[in-house]
């Protein structure tokens, strides 16, 4: 369960990185520099550093591809987990459970797993959490 949560957190992190906005262009940085009349050397160095971030698009491409790979592996893990849960919960054979899972969409599989783990966590909650 811990590994599943960590994997989901990593997937969310890569999704945020892949969908992030591109860095400002050098032209926009020059406008900012003119508007603010930068006299402070540290600000000028900071703006130079931002101008050197033109490789950001390449990095986003890398993370986008990595995101797709991680998402594919997470989907495979969810399929296997759903089959295991169905075998254990419903007492059916692995082949029957696999057939049921194959008939489900990815969204239905995610909802099935969330429902299962939600009930499991609800049962484990402390008694003093009732309101």
From Swiss-Prot:
Chief location bin: secreted
Expression (tissue specificity): Expressed by the venom gland.
A molecular-function term among this protein's GO annotations: toxin activity
Keyword NAD: no
Pfam families: Latarcin
Signal peptide range in chain numbering: 1-20
Single GO cellular component term: extracellular region
InterPro entries: Latarcin_precursor
Keywords: Antibiotic, Antimicrobial, Cytolysis, Hemolysis, Secreted, Signal, Toxin
Compartment(s) of residence: Secreted
Function: Insecticidal, cytolytic and antimicrobial peptide. Forms voltage-dependent, ion-permeable channels in membranes. At high concentration causes cell membrane lysis.
Family the entry assigns: Belongs to the cationic peptide 06 (cytoinsectotoxin) family.
Protein known as: M-zodatoxin-Lt8o
């Amino acid at each position: 369960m811990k590994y599943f949560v960590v994997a989901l957190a990593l997937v969310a992190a890569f999704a945020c990185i892949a969908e992030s906005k591109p860095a400002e262009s050098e032209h926009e940085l020059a406008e900012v520099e003119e508007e603010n009349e930068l006299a402070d050397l540290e600000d000028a160095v900071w703006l130079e550093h931002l101008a050197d971030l033109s490789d950001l698009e390449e990095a986003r491409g890398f993370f986008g591809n990595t995101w797709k790979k991680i998402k594919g592996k997470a989907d495979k893990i969810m399929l296997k987990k759903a089959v295991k849960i169905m075998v254990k919960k419903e007492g059916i054979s692995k082949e029957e459970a696999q057939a049921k899972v194959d008939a489900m969409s990815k969204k239905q599989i995610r909802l099935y797993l969330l429902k299962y783990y939600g009930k499991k966590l609800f049962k484990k909650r402390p008694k003093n959490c009732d309101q």
